Amino acid sequence: TPEHQRYIELFLVVDSGMFMKYNGNSDKI
């Protein structure tokens, strides 16, 4: 369903953002 696809895309965006933030903090340390 379109709603399910939208939810997956949102999850991927959030997951990617958290991953980049984690990498930034790790690299900073």
Curated annotation (Swiss-Prot):
Cite the binding residues for Ca(2+): 9
Q: Which cofactor does it need?
A: Zn(2+)
The catalytic activity of this protein is classed by the Enzyme Commission as: 3.4.24.50
The biological process GO terms on file are: proteolysis
State where the protein is found: Secreted
Binding note for cofactor: Binds 1 zinc ion per subunit.
The answer, when asked if Secreted is one of the entry's keywords, is yes
Q: Which domain of life is it from?
A: Eukaryota
Record SUPFAM superfamilies: Metalloproteases ('zincins'), catalytic domain
The reactions it catalyses are: Cleavage of 4-Gln-|-His-5, 9-Ser-|-His-10 and 14-Ala-|-Leu-15 of insulin B chain and Pro-|-Phe of angiotensin I
Q: Where is the Peptidase M12B domain?
A: 6-29
Task: Recite the UniProt keywords alphabetically.
Answer: Calcium, Hemostasis impairing toxin, Hydrolase, Metal-binding, Metalloprotease, Protease, Secreted, Toxin, Zinc
Q: Where are the transmembrane segments?
A: none
Tissues expressed in: Expressed by the venom gland.
**Which GO CC terms are listed, alphabetically?**
extracellular region
Could you state a single Gene Ontology molecular function term?
A: metal ion binding
Stated family: Belongs to the venom metalloproteinase (M12B) family.
UniProt function note: Snake venom zinc metalloproteinase that impairs hemostasis in the envenomed animal.
Q: What is this protein called?
A: Snake venom metalloproteinase bothrolysin
What is the species listed in this Swiss-Prot or TrEMBL entry?
Bothrops jararaca
